[in-house]
């Protein structure tokens, strides 16, 4: 639909209709006056789902979460001034985690800037270098030349959400008065309405969707050190595969291709729990989940040194693993989907401009057969994992929160969306999430690793999702974004929040700063003492305290009457930090316990 009421409604309706024809399905709108033309065009379109959010920061993370799950850009709309500035944290996260996002900020016309016109800031390049493309639209004009310009700018903007990788596009949209569709202005554009041919104007516009996640982009010849296949890459040495968070997200085919590579080469796979691969265990791959513990044993760490490493995605989170890798002098090949530097260790890594699918196909076509030495190497990893698992299972009997996290994988329905908050929940998952075949999808905000927007991101993931969505979070992360509960009525879906409440920043309890007792509690642990039952009642959210594993297992299938429910697990961060330290110490001095 094109609205010829006035130049602003014309511009906004042409922009929205063009984006819709390109594939826009979801918008998140923050109320405000200067963005009125955009809001009205989106609300009246009929083909775009619109969520309204009072808080711009919460809105932006809601859009981020939805983009994470769908892989499609979400239009994020706000008015002028500091409203737009509140989008910045989510834009930074979207940039680093490669989530498509189309930001539309309403603005005053240039003549009203730098003269204290009110609610006016400099919004040009407001988000710095984080958008992969940004521009300011020209003021709306009532002519076909402007419509053509707007159509092509919208087309370019949509494509830039996907290319060269998934990311953020910012369109600053200045509007002059009148901002609303007033009928008295319609007559002045009647000639344009008669000239406008919708069939001709939108001819050739078709849905432009994302590339497959994990698909390699075309790179300049000299960008990567080696192309693929490369004569420098020899699959014969003892090899190891590292799998971490995938920039741009994952697909089932990507994960099964990784397993195919591992099976074809006979390489064991050290898989971060923040990658969904742990939930795709096929029983035929040496999938190693306890690596953080077992490489703490000096004898094991020495015995398991590989001759070659293939890294897919980012490095796993484990500090122990990263320290171990820093002591190893062997080639590390990184499959570089989007041309990023994925080596925080600054090692002598070799980037391969290839997709996982290309490597899997190459290995299959070459007919690789792992030799006896490689099979023994993989078996050694599996045997040490078995021994370490015995120690861990015994220790978990004395740990409330870690045990709950370890068992959560067996409680959730298959194909659950699990969003994991940063800080301690990420570590509990890394340490104790088991390999399984339930195909859970793991989501994280590991672009910038912040705790902001945790609840809102999870709600965006849950919105219009067909299955279960679960948020695993600590108390501070949930409190930091408690405004997200205001979007409950807008969310179409269900969200279960597993709240690990240890009354403070549990991650700091595991760091050296915990020894500074005079400042630790007040300035780092920052306990808030919030009654979450009361907080949930304020927002009309179901709340239940989970005291044991049986309680947790009984929560699925869920029958909650409200879109959101909170299952609170109360823990003691002091005891849990000491317990974890003791468990890690067992492996550091484990020669007497293991073979």
From Swiss-Prot:
Keyword Manganese: yes
HAMAP family: MenD
Xref: NCBIfam families: menD
Disulfide bonds: none
Protein family membership: Belongs to the TPP enzyme family. MenD subfamily.
Source species taxonomy: Bacteria, Bacillati, Cyanobacteriota, Cyanophyceae, Synechococcales
Note on cofactor: Binds 1 thiamine pyrophosphate per subunit.
Entry-linked Gene3D superfamilies: 3.40.50.970, TPP-binding domain (3.40.50.1220)
SUPFAM superfamilies membership: Thiamin diphosphate-binding fold (THDP-binding)
Cofactor requirements of the protein: Mg(2+); Mn(2+); thiamine diphosphate
Enzyme Commission (EC) number: 2.2.1.9
Function noted in UniProt: Catalyzes the thiamine diphosphate-dependent decarboxylation of 2-oxoglutarate and the subsequent addition of the resulting succinic semialdehyde-thiamine pyrophosphate anion to isochorismate to yield 2-succinyl-5-enolpyruvyl-6-hydroxy-3-cyclohexene-1-carboxylate (SEPHCHC).
Protein name: 2-succinyl-5-enolpyruvyl-6-hydroxy-3-cyclohexene-1-carboxylate synthase
